[in-house]
Regions:
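Mid-domain catalytic core of redox enzymes
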Residues: 22, 230-362
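Conserved Rossmann-like nucleotide-cofactor binding loop
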Residues: 11, 34, 262
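Glycine-rich FAD pyrophosphate-binding loop
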Residues: 20-45
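Helical element adjacent to the flavin cofactor pocket in flavoenzyme catalytic cores
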Residues: 186-245
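Conserved flavin/dinucleotide-binding core of flavoenzymes
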Residues: 43, 100-101, 317-423
Length: 423
């Protein structure tokens, strides 16, 4: 069959790969200048050497990424273990800590004397014990903010641990995290061993940068990928699908929309009531990622430096401010420390900036979670199929799973989907 795939992020690439290997004639349309979406590795020249630095997709783990890992094995792509430490720095109060060890937890020695700091630690342990009970009911409307306040968790735990941790994971600001569905939040934490102090998955990175998997994944159909080709509209009829690209109408038998949910809705010339209802449930937040070498964005104390570093601000409506230490995450040995900061709330020295990139991340609400459950109502209807990480938690594994689900619906089950969450 002649099938159009719109979008070349992980979902678009995997669906195209599956459909191509099943013998279908595919065309992949990408609005941007490169293939990969959030898989965006930047080549940095420094002192005569080139360093591959990731700026979007960085890590995966051996518990909750079974389909992505299987795909990498099939493609022969190598990976390596990494560290996933987390720090919080509050410029207003001066508080900072790194949760890796007792020594780094008390990197700021004053924390030994702070009763509020011990309250936070106590509530971290308490949350690990009590939060899983939330999974025994089906309340999808309760927000994480309502849950912790209802159960009398301390302000220190909420503001200096839970909201920063969630914000760093989902690239969401404090106000957005407060409205995050509690059950969804806890399920993710449980799946990833984040409610335990010892049983944790092994996190990994793609050797040589995340983009290393793009060539082997897209090589079989590289001549069918069209960059700088934003789709303007999609019109469906009984005989096929008409896609308008660069003011040129092209006909296909089916279309796979691997763009964001809100983008998918805008592209449809004739959305059904179900498509309108489901896709309008997904909203996004635009985050600016800056690749730089300005160490002022890291915690003040060297002992508090972590792989992920959350810098608190005073405006809860502001976007998430988090800095990733790419040398630590990717094992980069360079004379400079490469950092990626999302939405800096401290000015970065202009001479230290290497690249600016804009990403959009799903904003999870009870409406979004409800919309996810209605995928079957719109997928395959009017010759249109939907995939994207937004159908899950918003990560690479979710993108792969959604693509395999679409491929199966089109009779192209090249890689059998696994639902395993290793424990």
């Amino acid at each position: 069959m002649k099938i159009a795939v719109i979008g070349s992020g992980i979902s678009g690439m995997v669906s195209a790969w599956s459909l191509h290997h099943a013998g279908h004639e595919i065309s992949v349309f990408e609005a941007g200048t490169y293939v990969g979406g959030h898989t965006n590795t930047v080549a940095v020249e420094l002192a005569g050497k080139t360093y591959a630095v990731d700026t979007g997709f960085i890590v995966f783990n051996d518990w909750t990424y079974p389909n992505f890992i299987r795909l990498m094995e099939v493609l022969g792509v190598k990976s390596q273990p990494t560290t996933m430490s987390f720090s919080v720095h509050d410029p207003l109060s001066g508080l900072e800590y790194n949760g890796t060890s007792i020594n780094t937890l008390f990197a700021q020695r004053r924390n030994f004397l702070r009763p509020s700091f011990y309250r936070m630690i106590r509530d971290i342990l308490r949350f690990g014990r009590e939060a899983p009970l939330l999974l025994n009911n089906d309340d999808t409307l309760l927000t994480i903010d309502e849950y912790v306040k209802k159960n009398n968790y301390s302000k220190e735990f909420i503001e200096h641990y839970l909201l920063p941790m969630g914000g760093a994971i989902w690239s969401a600001g404090t106000a957005a995290m407060r409205t995050f569905p509690a059950r969804y939040f806890v399920q993710f934490f449980k799946n990833h061993g984040m409610l335990s102090v010892d049983a944790r998955p092994q996190w990994r990175v793609i050797s040589g940068g995340s983009a290393s998997y793009i060539k082997p994944l897209t090589e079989p159909f590289k001549n069918r990928i069209y960059l700088n080709s934003p789709v303007q509209s999609i019109r469906r009829d009984h005989c096929g699908v008409t896609i308008l690209v660069n003011n040129e109408a092209q006909r296909f038998e089916h279309v796979v929309i691997a763009a964001h949910g809100d983008q998918a809705l805008r592209l449809l010339s004739d959305p059904t009531p179900s498509e309108q209802a489901v896709l309008s449930g997904f909203t996004y937040t635009r985050n600016e990622a800056i690749l730089h070498t300005d160490m002022r964005l890291m915690p003040r104390r060297r002992l508090a430096w972590a792989a992920w570093n959350y810098r608190m601000g005073t405006d809860e409506s502001a976007l998430v401010p988090v800095t990733y230490d790419m040398n630590a995450l990717q094992g980069i040995d360079a004379p400079e420390r490469f950092l990626v900061t999302l939405n800096p709330n401290e000015p970065i020295a202009s001479g230290r900036i290497l690249r600016r990139i804009s990403y959009q991340h799903p904003h999870y609400t009870s409406q979004a979670v409800a919309a996810q459950k209605r995928w079957h109502e719109i997928n395959g209807v009017n010759r249109t199929y939907y995939c994207g990480a937004y159908w899950g938690y918003g990560f690479h594994e979710d993108g792969v799973v959604s693509a395999l689900r679409v491929a199966k619906a089109l009779g192209a089950e090249i890689l059998t989907q696994s639902t395993r969450v290793a424990r």
